[in-house]
Every structure is written in C-alpha cells, then in structure tokens.
Design a protein with these regions (language model features):
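Short N-terminal targeting/anchoring amphipathic segment
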Residues: 70-88, 99-105
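Conserved donor-binding/catalytic core segment of Leloir-type glycosyltransferases
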Residues: 200-227, 241
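Nucleotide-sugar-dependent
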Residues: 20, 218, 277-281, 289-308, ...
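Nucleotide-activated donor-binding/catalytic signature segment of Leloir-type glycosyltransferases, i.e.
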Residues: 243-244, 252-281
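Membrane-proximal helix-turn-helix segments that form the acceptor-binding/catalytic region
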Residues: 66-70, 94-98, 109-112, 126-156
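Carbohydrate-associated surface elements
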Residues: 162, 183
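Conserved acidic donor-binding segment of nucleotide-sugar-dependent glycosyltransferases
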Residues: 331-343, 351-357
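A short, well-ordered alpha-helix in the C-terminal region of glycosyltransferases
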Residues: 351, 358-373, 384-385
Length: 395
C-alpha cells in the first residue's frame, strides 16, 4: 500500500460493460486508487452479450443497480458514486438521502446535451420517431441531471475546468466540483514490446496518423481536406492513417466517400477498431500525429486522450485550439497548435515534415509533461486526496 491510512470503500455505478477498456475507470479505480487505500466496488453492465432484447437488458441492469443501492450502508461504503447515468442518479439520490449516505456524480461527457443536439441535427441519419424519442430522452435526462441529481450531490467530478464552468451555470457551486481530466496509462503505452509498425503499402511515404473515434461528430473530413491541400502543394506522397472506427458503418462510409471524391482513396487508410497495443504500434510507425477536436459546446468541455498519448510516445504532433489540448500544448511545448481549418492543419504538417529531426527533439519533452501532470499515477493520487477529504467531511 502506498499509504498507511485506513481503507475507504466506494460503491460506483457505471454504464460501461465490465470489464471495461476505459482507462479512467479501469486504471484509476482498478489499479491506482487501491494503492492509496481507496477501494471501489464497480457495478456495470455484463461484458458479454446477454440474451434478450435491449429493454430487457436495460431493465436487468437497472434492477442490479437498485439491489446494490438498497443493500449499501455507511458501514460498508463511505459514499455512492454514479457515473453518466442521470436517471439512475435520481434513484440513487432518493436511496442515499434515506440512508444518510453521501452521493457523488461523475460526468465524463455532456450526454444529455449531446442527445438534444443530435436530435436537432440534420446530419444525423435518424428516422422521425427515433429523432423525437432522442429529443425527449435528452430533455428528460437534462432535467433530471441539473434539477434533481447534481443539486443533491455532495460532490461532482467533471472532465475539465471548462466543464465545471458549464455545470456551474446550472447552479452547482464550483467549489463542489473537481476536474479529473483524462490521462495516460504509462505502463501500458511504454511497453517495450510495442514496436513501431508501418503499413506494407506505405513503406517509405510520410504518414500523418490520427488515433481515436471516427464518429461524424468529430468532423474528420477536415483531415481529408488537409490531405488534399498537401497534395495540391506538391506533397503527393503524404498519406493519412486513421486508426479507429465509427459508431456505425455510416461514419466510415462518409469518410471513404469524401476521399474518393477528392481522388485520395489510395492516400487514406482506415484500420477499424484495434487493440491498444496494435493501435499504438501503428501510431509509432507514423511520422507525425494529429488531434483535431471540433470547437463547440459539447467538445469544448472534453478532455481528449489522443493528444496525451501522442506526447507520451514522443510523436511530433499537431492539435487545434480545443481548450484542454491547447492548455496541454502550451504547457508542454511539445507540439504545434493551430485552428481547426484544413489550410492551417496543412501548413503545420508541412512545418513538421520539412524538419522532422527538430520536431522529434521538441516532441521528446512531451513524456516528461505527461509523467508530471497527466499520468494516471499522478491523477489517481490527486483524486485519492479528494476522496479522503470528502470522507472526512462526511464522517
């Protein structure tokens, strides 16, 4: 144990299937916090595919959470924490109030706002009934979260200081919130067994890599437009590697069609979803990495992981002025910052590709920054201190 203090145990309800690949759940609560005497009982959906329809599975998960909440008590847990489930948070509020147990809420994304935006967007391929259902659910979730759950919580954990400001607009005091940004699991990403790998069809071409979600919300067509500009400026040998997948086939179909219309089918490759080690190997084999985060109310409050992984690997990288990654790039000095326009992305890519040795020297400082500020070891120690303070206040 990293500390000799008494152990504290937290009951946390999460929407993810367990075991989960999400490092902010798996690493923080499964590996790091126990080293500081903070133990967590995680309640999530089954990791395999259970029998029955979706409604039956959702009801089964709800009943599992309800049973755990009803069985919980102050002798066993110092608090209950609900992650990203506003409607279940209402139930937890009632039960915790009855039992005199502190309730925490963890917000990793603005899910209610996202559903409202998607329902109103003409870009979303939704039928009329599904669009109405999504809008109604989003509004209901928004009301439950900001009117019923968060005001009753002892503490709220958010992804960024920008998200804290967003939540504060709805009446939650900022001193009642703690920002826990995304981090990097350095033990995994720096595994010596992960060796740089290049696609066989691009053995010598300069490769720009992107690692992450390919959802339409990410507006990755800007990268295809960037690639088109690079080719127009005499960089016909530059290739674009998209490491990841979309939520549905329409996301990747859209990107492939954009590339086809621009005559870039052979200059772009989508890997689909890959295990972490395989994805990092391809990333390490690229020449530069890029992290475009569209600006807007939803993603401006996010804490992107991809840029942090680029820095941990010492990759020459480009990131746009999304608040969290702009802060990271300015503080680390390890990459280039620009606005999210195809022209500026292309200009920064040329700047790096024309002087890769200097870019690699600058990028090497990224790992030190991650170790000091954004490793899960550091974030976990800070989070453990917050939990101990909260446990002391509620004792």
């Amino acid at each position: 144990m990293a500390e000799s203090r008494p152990e504290l145990r937290l009951l946390q309800l999460v929407p993810e299937p367990l075991p989960t690949h999400r490092p902010d759940v798996r690493v923080l609560f499964g590996d790091i916090l126990p080293q500081h005497g903070i133990l967590c009982d995680l309640i999530g959906r089954p990791g395999d595919t259970p029998e029955g329809g979706r409604l039956r599975r959702e009801f089964s998960f709800f009943m599992l959470c309800l049973r755990q909440l009803l069985a919980a008590n102050r002798r066993q847990y110092f608090a209950v924490q609900v992650r990203d489930m506003a409607l279940l948070g209402v139930v937890a509020r009632i039960i915790c109030a009855f039992k005199g147990m502190p309730l925490f809420y963890w917000m990793s994304f603005l899910f209610a706002e996202s559903r409202i935006v998607r329902a109103a967007s003409a870009d979303e391929p939704l039928g009329r009934l599904r669009r109405i259902a999504l809008a109604v659910y989003g509004r209901l979730e928004h009301f439950a979260l900001y009117r019923l759950v968060l005001p009753a919580c002892r503490h709220v954990f958010v992804q960024s200081s920008a998200m804290a400001r967003h939540v504060a607009v709805h009446g939650v005091p900022e001193d009642k919130m703690t920002a826990v940004p995304m981090g990097v699991d350095l033990d995994r990403i720096l595994d010596p067994a992960i060796v740089a790998q290049r696609l066989p069809q691009w053995p010598d071409q300069p490769v720009i890599a992107y690692l992450g979600s390919l959802d339409t919300l990410r507006r990755l067509d800007a990268l295809i437009d960037m690639l088109k500009i690079l080719h127009q400026r005499g960089r016909e040998n530059v290739r674009l590697l998209l490491i990841g997948d979309g939520s549905c086939a329409a996301d990747t179909d859209f990107l492939r069609e954009q590339a086809r219309q621009s005559g870039l089918e052979q200059a772009m490759h989508i890997t689909g979803w890959l295990p972490g080690a395989q994805a990092w190997a391809l990333l390490k084999g690229a020449d530069i990495a890029i992290s475009p985060i569209p600006r807007g109310p939803l993603l401006d409050v996010s804490s992107p992981t991809k840029l942090l992984e680029y820095l941990a690997l010492g990759m020459p990288c480009i990131g746009n002025d999304s608040p969290d990654q702009a802060e990271v790039l300015k503080a680390s000095g390890a990459g280039l910052l620009c606005r999210l326009t195809p022209t500026e992305l292309a200009e920064r890519a040329i700047e790096l590709l024309d002087n890769l040795p200097a870019a690699r020297v600058r990028a090497a400082s990224g790992l030190d920054y991650i170790r000091q500020q954004r490793s899960y070891s550091v974030l976990g120690a800070r989070l453990a201190a917050v939990y101990r303070r909260l446990a002391g206040e509620s004792a």
